[in-house]
Amino acid sequence: MFKEFKAFAMRGNVVDMAVGIIIGAAFGAIVKSLVDDVIMPPIGLLLGNVDFSNLFIVLKDGAEVAPPYASVAAAQAAGAVTLNYGLFINAVVSFTIVAFAVFLLIRAINKLKAEEPAAPEVTPEDIVLLREIRDALKK
């Protein structure tokens, strides 16, 4: 059973998939930092110093501290139930960037693939015979 598992795990597809998952996780961390630390702060500044990660709606006040809450973390620490739409906006921007990067990658891979030349069209046998008859009649 161990030999079968080893053969399965060492197949090219499984190893390639594992490498892809690891690189994908690292890429996800880079994109999250790009969105949270580079893209969203200028957008928030343009919209009047809005910190998207702290945009939320209190659905139910916390039992420990009364609203208003300064941040999502403060609201949740107080036991409030929150709808964190700012974090959702950040996630949508992150997803869009990842989806676009994957699109560009797939597009580049498709361009690199050598297009196989189309097989020459085979002339039907009756057409070949008719051409031979025509050529014979011309002589």
From Swiss-Prot:
Listed GO CC annotations: plasma membrane
PROSITE patterns reported for this sequence: MSCL (PS01327)
MF GO annotations: mechanosensitive monoatomic ion channel activity
Pfam family, one: MscL
Record's signal peptide: none
Keyword Membrane among UniProt keywords: yes
Annotated SUPFAM superfamilies: Gated mechanosensitive channel (SSF81330)
Topology of the protein relative to the lipid bilayer: Multi-pass membrane protein
TM ranges: 14-34, 86-106
Reported function: Channel that opens in response to stretch forces in the membrane lipid bilayer. May participate in the regulation of osmotic pressure changes within the cell.
HAMAP family listed in its UniProt record: MscL
Annotated family: Belongs to the MscL family.
Subunit structure: Homopentamer.
Protein name (database record): Large-conductance mechanosensitive channel
Organism: Methylobacillus flagellatus (strain ATCC 51484 / DSM 6875 / VKM B-1610 / KT)
Gene: mscL
